[in-house]
Regions:
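Membrane-embedded alpha-helical bundles that constitute the cytochrome b-like, heme-associated redox core
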Residues: 1-163
Length: 163
């Protein structure tokens, strides 16, 4: 019998990753300030280093939690797509989920390459290209969940929240 809802662990991982991603996307100032100082040859103060470390450690936590989440997804599975929808909707959902997983690995890895290894191109990729792509995919993910709930009247949103 296919699962009808995500497990409690899957839900906790989903919303923990969502909260950490929101934190790093909405509050990147510590890393940005540290980067500006280093770029201009200035010495970061301990508070600057601490703020940058918080951003980096949140990114590492995201990487770890996404790896655990993906392992659980592979071993335990996920609820099936709702019936009665156009096949393109299922393909789009799969594409967005796959790209989100890829970005949630690429963002922390590129950030670590920039911060800990000093690889400038990784920093540019991280802060400009991947960050923009992540915002777009997050928008698509939220829009898709809302469309499932309000337009298609499916249980997709409920099974990641209350069910």
């Amino acid at each position: 019998m296919p699962m009808r809802s995500y497990s409690t662990v899957q839900k906790l991982l989903h919303w923990s990753v969502a909260a950490l991603v929101a934190f790093n996307l909405l509050l990147p100032d510590g890393m940005n300030a540290w980067h500006r100082l280093v770029k201009h040859g200035q010495v970061p103060q301990p508070a600057d280093i601490s703020a940058a470390n918080i951003h980096a450690l949140v990114g590492i936590a995201i990487l770890f939690l996404v790896a655990v989440r993906l392992a659980i997804r592979i071993t335990s599975g996920v609820p099936p797509q709702p019936n009665g929808q156009p096949p393109i909707i299922h393909r789009l959902a799969g594409l967005v989920h796959g790209l989100l997983y890829a970005l949630l690995f690429a963002m922390p890895i590129s950030g670590m390459m920039a911060y800990y290894m000093g690889i400038d191109v990784a920093g540019t990729l991280h802060a400009e290209v991947l960050k923009t792509a992540l915002w777009l995919l997050l928008g698509a993910h939220v829009a898709g969940a809302l469309a499932q709930h309000f337009y298609f009247k499916s249980d997709v949103l409920r099974r990641m929240t209350v069910s």
